[in-house]
């Protein structure tokens, strides 16, 4: 049957005879079955069962002579393989994973092009859905192109990056065209015409045994996927005896719905991602992309992604992951909180995600395509975290074996300042984790939350464990473990536990000595990782002080190094009050270790960093005026001078911590916002501009710059809270 459709051999892209109605009906069901099986396989991937997914789509079929169906025929199957390798590549950044993903996605692209060509060569005048013939293959092609472009960007090659832009442009144009078809199909006449066509096709196969067998298999597969338990065992159904005209018509309609689901959810996801990403990249890059046809709309992109979450398939799951990253990612970490938002209620301790308003807001969003603009009314959740929470709980049910969704649930709890609950969720045992990259991500996030809770012993142990399960950032993990050990050493000094203090000190010394030798083992885009640059400078400064004053390396550490890490990861905004109290009263009360045998006076640069961290901690404790005074009197005065009612950079002071001055200027802006709210917007902007213009490039400039950019977006109304 597949050979009759021109799908059964490599030469299947050659012209064949036009399809008759009976063959078109069989083709619809066969296509729909492949999509359903691909959906199930990709659900398995989302449930951390990639091996099962590969086994499902690479099984042999009767008459296939032992050859893999996935390798010879289905673009949808090849897309599944591409998705599996793509996830591995983007989570691990390993060269071999990137190469494998690129090859698999290239095969998926080629298969989609070949099968789209088959449809044209066969002269099919009847579409398998309400969209033009072969649209499902165009969507598969666009998905493969989009993932392939991202994979090429990871290859660290200029030539590959140029190829990636070309792929992105093709994917964008394809999705733009299909998006127009989808909007056109919403017209009542179109749907009615397609329904009549399907009804007439069913008459041609009312007694066809091959059709009956295909219908039975399709409906069992479809029911299996739609079963919320996501059990891989096929669900028994009444489809086994479906061989009447009525059942054929029903099956054809269901098959058409499956194909339409793939098309619509795929476009919502992929075009939504493109629209959103293009809208939030830096303006300079955005202008360059617009010249070559890329145009984005944040609201349009978000609305498409929210629409995609209505589908119970891989596209809906990935859309939810993107939304979780958008709302609880970098923009969520902004300290500039708008009044009346979810974040405002969270900060006040008045937010209950289970009772939050679940209504929607209506807006006119501009969907921007290569041929111009079109306006469309969309609804977005008034409280997106409430909606995401419900979807996330459903995803945990759909994918019970996956640590990926446990990770997302933990992150969501942490974003609401429920650190203990987040750690408890991530501590739950769900059995072995197949995706080691997800295991590493969850362990890292959980360990950072423990760090925010001042659990230094557990954190140190976990950072060392991360070295064993993650190929990246070994120098950074070693350094942070060392900073935890330094804090354990100081805690034991305060408690008078000499033996425990010595043990922690020895561990910290060993780790600080090892960390520099691990720098450069892994690079991103051929550059040393920013945190590696930071830790190299920090350890070098400790070594210089150690030699200069003839003291132990650990006693030259200065202000709590682990609290610098907490600050870089926006930990103060998530800490419970008791953790903040301890940090302020004990950890940030001094630099270095006054009780240590080899204590030296506090260095000027260490004192400045300590005062900056104290000020931020106090603001998050609600002691705004006290924090403002510490920041203004002890930090800002060394960075900024004022004359003629204008601020100027103080060039007379040399700063040994390059990240500190722009960070302090940013924090000054945040104090203005907390103290004066929207009334102080102009002053807030002034301080943000000072932070933004401090320097084009400095240590951790990307991390600090993201916070500054996020604050500007909030002020401009450019980010949904």
UniProtKB/Swiss-Prot annotation:
Subcellular location: Cytoplasm; Nucleus
InterPro entries per record: Iml2/TPR_39 (IPR019412)
Keyword Nucleus listed: yes
UniProt entry tagged with the keyword Phosphoprotein: yes
One GO cellular component term: nucleus
Lineage: superkingdom: Eukaryota
Keywords for the protein's UniProt record, in alphabetical order: Cytoplasm, Nucleus, Phosphoprotein
Family, as annotated: Belongs to the IML2 family.
Known function: Inclusion body (IB) resident protein that interacts strongly with lipid droplet (LD) proteins. Involved in LD-mediated IB clearing after protein folding stress, probably by enabling access to the IBs of an LD-stored soluble sterol derivative that acts as a chaperone in inclusion clearing.
Subunit note: Interacts with lipid droplet proteins.
Protein name, UniProt field: Inclusion body clearance protein IML2
Provenance organism: Yarrowia lipolytica (strain CLIB 122 / E 150)
Protein encoded by which gene: IML2
């Amino acid at each position: 049957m597949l050979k009759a459709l021109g799908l059964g051999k490599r030469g299947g892209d050659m012209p064949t005879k036009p399809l008759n109605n009976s063959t078109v009906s069989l083709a619809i069901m066969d296509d729909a079955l492949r999509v359903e099986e691909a959906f199930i396989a990709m659900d398995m991937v989302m449930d951390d069962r990639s091996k099962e997914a590969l086994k499902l789509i690479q099984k042999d079929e009767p008459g296939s002579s032992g050859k893999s169906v996935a390798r010879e025929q289905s673009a949808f199957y090849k897309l599944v393989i591409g998705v599996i390798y793509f996830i591995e590549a983007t989570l691990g950044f390993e060269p071999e994973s990137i190469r494998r993903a690129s090859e698999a996605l290239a095969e998926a692209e080629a298969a989609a092009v070949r099968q789209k060509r088959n449809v044209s060569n066969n002269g099919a005048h009847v579409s398998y859905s309400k969209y033009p013939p072969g649209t499902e293959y165009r969507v598969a092609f666009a998905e493969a192109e989009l993932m392939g472009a991202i994979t090429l960007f990871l290859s660290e090659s200029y030539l590959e990056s140029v190829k990636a832009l070309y792929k992105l442009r093709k994917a964008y144009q394809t999705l733009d065209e299909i998006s127009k078809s989808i909007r056109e199909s919403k017209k009542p006449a179109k749907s009615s015409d397609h329904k009549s066509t399907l009804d007439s096709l069913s008459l041609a196969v009312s007694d066809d045994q091959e059709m009956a067998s295909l219908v039975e298999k399709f409906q069992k597969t479809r029911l299996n996927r739609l079963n919320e338990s996501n059990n891989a065992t096929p669900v028994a159904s009444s489809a086994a005896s479906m061989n009447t005209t009525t059942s054929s018509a029903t099956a054809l309609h269901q098959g058409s719905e499956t194909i339409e689901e793939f098309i619509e959810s795929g476009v919502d996801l992929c075009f939504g991602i493109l629209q959103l990403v293009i809208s939030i990249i830096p303006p300079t890059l955005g202008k360059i992309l617009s010249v070559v046809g890329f145009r984005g709309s944040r609201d349009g992109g978000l609305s498409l992604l929210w629409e995609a979450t209505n589908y119970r398939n891989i596209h809906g799951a990935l859309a939810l992951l993107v939304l979780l990253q958008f709302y609880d990612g970098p923009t969520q970490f902004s300290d500039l909180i708008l009044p009346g938002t979810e974040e405002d209620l969270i900060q006040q301790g008045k937010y209950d995600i289970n009772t939050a308003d679940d209504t929607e807001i209506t807006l006119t969003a501009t969907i921007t395509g290569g041929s111009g603009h079109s306006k469309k009314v969309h609804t977005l959740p008034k409280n997106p975290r409430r909606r995401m929470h419900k979807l996330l709980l459903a995803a945990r049910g759909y994918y019970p074996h996956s640590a990926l969704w446990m990770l997302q649930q933990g992150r969501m709890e942490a974003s609401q300042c429920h650190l203990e609950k987040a750690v408890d969720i991530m501590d739950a045992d769900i059995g072995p984790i197949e995706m080691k990259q997800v295991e590493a991500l969850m362990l890292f996030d959980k360990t950072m939350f423990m760090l925010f809770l001042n659990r230094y012993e557990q954190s140190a142990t976990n950072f060392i464990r991360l070295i064993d399960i993650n190929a990246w950032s070994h120098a950074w993990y070693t350094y942070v473990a060392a900073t935890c050990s330094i804090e354990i050493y100081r805690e034991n000094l305060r408690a008078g536990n000499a033996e425990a203090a010595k043990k922690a000190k020895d561990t910290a010394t060993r780790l600080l000595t090892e960390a520099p030798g691990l720098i450069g083992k892994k690079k991103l885009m051929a550059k040393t990782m920013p945190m590696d640059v930071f830790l190299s400078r920090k350890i070098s400064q400790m070594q210089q002080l150690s030699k200069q004053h003839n003291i132990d390396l650990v006693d030259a550490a200065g202000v709590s190094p682990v609290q610098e890490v907490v600050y870089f990861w926006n930990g103060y905004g998530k800490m419970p009050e008791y953790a903040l109290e301890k940090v302020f009263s004990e950890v940030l009360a001094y630099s270095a270790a006054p009780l240590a045998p080899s204590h030296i006076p506090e260095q000027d640069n260490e004192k400045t960093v300590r005062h900056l961290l104290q000020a931020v901690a106090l603001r998050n404790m609600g002691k705004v005026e006290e924090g403002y005074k510490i920041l203004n009197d002890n930090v800002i005065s060394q960075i900024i001078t004022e004359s003629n009612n204008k601020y100027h950079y103080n060039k007379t002071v040399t700063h040994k911590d390059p990240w500190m001055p722009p960070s302090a200027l940013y924090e000054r802006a945040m104090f203005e916002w907390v103290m004066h709210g929207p009334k102080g917007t102009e002053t807030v902007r002034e301080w943000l501009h000072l932070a933004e213009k401090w320097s084009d490039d400095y240590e951790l400039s990307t991390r600090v710059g993201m916070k500054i950019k996020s604050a500007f977006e909030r002020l401009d109304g450019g980010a949904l809270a």
